[in-house]
C-alpha cells in the first residue's frame, strides 16, 4: 500500500494576496458579464450564493447545486444562457489574474521529492471556486 500525502492548496502550496485577488476576480468577472448582467447585481448574487455555500450543512446537495440554485435566479437569467460565457471566463480570463498569487518556494521541491519517493499526492482546498478555477490555481502553485 502506498502512502498518500495531503497538502492544502491555500497558504501551503500557493500564496494568494486576497486583498488584491478578490477585487481583481470580481472586476474581471463583472467586465466579462457586462451587457448581460449589471456588475452590482452580479456581485450581490455572487456574494449571496457564496455565503449560502459557506452556511450549508445539507449533505444531499453539492455546493455547486446550492450556489447555482440561488445565483442564476438572482441574476434573472438561466444557467443555460450564461454557461458558455462563464466557461469562456474561466478558460481565458481567470488565468490572467494569477499574478496576485505566488508559488510557495519550498512547495514544488517537496511535491517533486514526495513523488520521487513513490508517494501519492492529494491536494485539498476550500471548494468555493468552480472546478476550472481550482485547476488553474493548482497550476499556479
Residue spans of the language-model regions?
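Active-site neighborhood of HAD-like aspartate-dependent phosphohydrolases
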Residues: 1-48
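Short, flexible/disordered intra-domain loops and linkers
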Residues: 18-22, 56-59, 131-132
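A generic "structured core" feature
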Residues: 13-15, 100-101, 140-141
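Short, surface-exposed alpha-helical segments at coil->helix boundaries
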Residues: 23, 27, 65, 131-136
